[in-house]
Structures are given as structure tokens and as C-alpha cells.
């Protein structure tokens, strides 16, 4: 049985895949192109179609997830607008650096090594900090813009950056103030890395918002997704003009992610912030291993390594999304038990 020239089995696969990635996307503010594009390439789609369809999927999913985070009060629009401005400038400079390396013939090697080390480094750092229990992640889940974040809830690096009182000062969600120039500097740095590595950068921005600026983890996720709406929208529009976006891929993926993104976003208001950081770190560490395996397969001309890499990525996605879902259900059950005990008393 086929629909629009695509087998029902493949459509069902895309819907399930979209649900899985949607949960991760709504929960972490990353994972779309990181997972979709490699999967489509291994399935035999042309690189342009894979990239374009991946971007269109990221755009649609980020809109859905951002709306849910907005309902939970987890999007700082002012910070998001500033991050977009700084990130855009950084991406342009990063692209210049990448083009220079391409002219020298070093681009593939340098970018691959940098990508693996960055994924692994951020993953190790976030996991270590979460297990140490330093910095609880700011406000508890549903964030009141006028509520204050205590110093104990803000990472030391962010406290140091906040101490530079260079005007103008911007008041962010959580009641703390940060210099406009510090925000733009962090945004520029994350954009520089994104442009240099040729990736969306969600895995860079989310920890940067928390560890460098001091934004509560759920708000960091929601604000990161708000930024992705714009970057994904522009990329999708440009590729759609050339007809590279394959709707037979995008529509079933979005059908699954429409539910997954809302579930993932809702889970950020239930799951402990320490657990969020641990899951995020584990996802990046496994992603680093998968990318390293794929690159080694290319160097030694072992095609099967691409499949092994994809299995690692999909396995990581299944494992982490399952852990997220389990943690959210556990929190709901504990809350229900608590209410039942209170009612009996």
C-alpha cells in the first residue's frame, strides 16, 4: 500500500521517528537535524534533499515546541532576540573561517575533529556538573519573570559574567541583570562555532544560556527553540525555493513530532533540572561517539560504519527519550500520591 508514492511502512516509520525526535527536541531544544539528516542520508536520499527536509522538519517542530514552552512561561523573548542578533553575526564569521579552511583543503578533517571534541567536551562538562549538583538550574520550572534567582542557583561562570556591570544592563527572566554586551558576546561565540561547524547549534546554545548567562534550564530550552524558529524558517524557505524539500518526508515526520514536541516540552516542567542536564550530557556523549565512528568509516573506507553510527544515534535517541518519558511519568505519579496522602490527612 502506498500514499503519495511512499509505502505505508515508510510513512509509519517516519511518524514514529518524528515522535521520538519531537520528544528530544521539545525537552532539550536540539536534536532535529542532528538526527534526521544523517538518518535520511543512510536511507539513500540525496544530501540536498536530506538537509532541506531536515531543516523544514526542524522549523515545524520548533514552532510546535516553542508554543508549548510559551504556555509554560519558559521563553524569554527579549533574550532570544538578542541571541539571534549576536548568533547571526557569529555564524557569518564562522563561515568565513570554514571557507578559508576549505581553500587549504583542511576543512573536513578540522571540522570533524572539532565537532567530536565539542560534542564530547560539552557532554562531559554538563554531566559532571549535574552529578556534582552545583547550580540547581535557577527557578523551579514555571518561571515568574519577577521572581528572583538566588546566587546558589546560578553557575559560577555565569555569576562572574553577571558581575561585569557594563551598561546597558538587561533584566532577564528570573530577576537578574546581565550586560547587553556580555549577552551579545556569548551569542556571537555560539554563532561562531555554529557557522564554523556547519550545524544548527542547539547543543551549544542551550548550555551556553545556562552556564554562561545563568538562565534557568527550562527557560534556556524554550528560548533556544525560539531562536531555532527563525534560523530553521529562513533555511527552509531558501531550500524550498529550489524545490529541495520533500513533503513526503516532512509531513509524516511532523505528524509524529507534533505530539512528541509537546510531550517533551511539558516534561521540562516535571523532570528535575539535574536529570535534564544528565540526559542532555549523555545524549551529547553518545552523539560524539556516533560522529567519530562515521568519520573513521569515511577515512578507512568502511561503508558499514555509517550504519553503525546511525544505530548508535538512534539507540541514544530511543534510550534518552525513554528515560525522559519515564521520569515525567514518575513525577506525575509521585505528585498524585502526594495529593492523595494530603487528602487523607
Q: Where are the predicted features?
A:
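Serine/threonine-rich low-complexity intrinsically disordered regions
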Residues: 7, 150, 155, 173, ...
Amino acid at each position: 500500500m502506498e500514499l503519495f508514492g511512499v509505502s505505508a511502512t515508510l510513512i509509519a516509520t517516519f511518524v514514529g521517528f518524528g515522535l521520538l525526535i519531537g520528544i528530544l527536541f521539545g525537552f532539550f531544544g536540539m536534536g532535529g537535524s542532528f538526527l534526521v539528516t544523517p538518518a535520511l542520508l543512510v536511507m539513500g536520499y540525496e544530501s540536498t534533499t536530506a538537509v532541506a527536509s531536515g531543516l523544514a522538519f526542524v522549523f515545524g517542530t520548533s514552532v510546535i515546541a516553542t508554543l508549548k514552552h510559551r504556555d509554560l512561561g519558559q521563553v524569554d523573548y527579549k533574550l532570544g532576540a538578542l541571541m539571534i542578533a549576536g548568533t547571526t553575526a557569529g555564524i557569518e564569521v564562522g563561515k568565513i573561517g570554514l571557507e578559508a579552511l576549505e581553500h587549504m583543503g583542511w576543512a573536513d578533517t578540522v571540522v570533524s575533529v572539532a565537532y567530536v571534541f565539542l560534542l564530547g567536551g560539552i557532554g562531559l562538562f554538563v554531566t559532571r556538573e549535574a552529578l556534582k549538583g552545583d547550580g540547581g538550574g535557577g527557578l523551579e520550572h514555571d518561571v515568574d519573570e519577577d521572581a528572583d534567582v538566588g546566587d546558589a542557583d546560578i553557575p559560577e561562570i555565569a555569576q562572574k559574567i553577571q558581575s561585569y556591570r557594563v551598561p546597558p544592563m538587561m533584566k532577564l527572566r528570573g530577576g537578574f541583570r546581565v550586560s547587553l554586551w556580555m549577552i551579545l558576546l556569548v551569542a556571537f561565540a555560539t554563532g561562531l562555532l555554529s557557522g564554523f561547524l556547519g550545524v544548527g547549534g542547539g547543543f551549544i546554545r542551550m548550555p551556553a544560556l545556562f552556564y554562561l548567562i545563568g538562565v534557568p534550564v527550562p527557560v534556556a530550552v524554550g528560548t533556544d527553540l525560539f531562536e531555532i524558529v527563525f534560523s530553521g524558517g529562513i533555511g527552509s524557505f531558501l531550500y524550498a525555493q529550489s524545490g529541495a524539500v520533500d513533503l513526503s518526508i516532512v509531513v509524516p515526520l511532523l505528524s509524529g513530532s507534533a505530539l512528541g514536541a509537546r510531550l517533551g516540552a511539558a516534561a521540562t516542567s516535571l523532570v528535575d533540572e539535574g536529570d535534564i542536564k544528565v540526559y542532555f550530557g549523555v545524549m551529547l556523549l553518545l552523539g560524539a561517539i556516533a560522529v567519530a565512528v562515521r568519520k573513521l568509516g569515511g577515512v578507512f573506507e568502511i561503508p558499514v560504519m555509517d550504519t553503525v553510527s546511525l544505530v548508535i544515534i538512534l539507540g541514544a535517541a530511543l534510550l534518552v527519550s525513554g528515560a525522559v518519558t519515564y521520569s515525567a511519568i514518575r513525577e506525575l505519579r509521585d505528585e498524585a500520591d502526594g495529593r492523595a496522602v494530603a487528602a487523607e490527612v
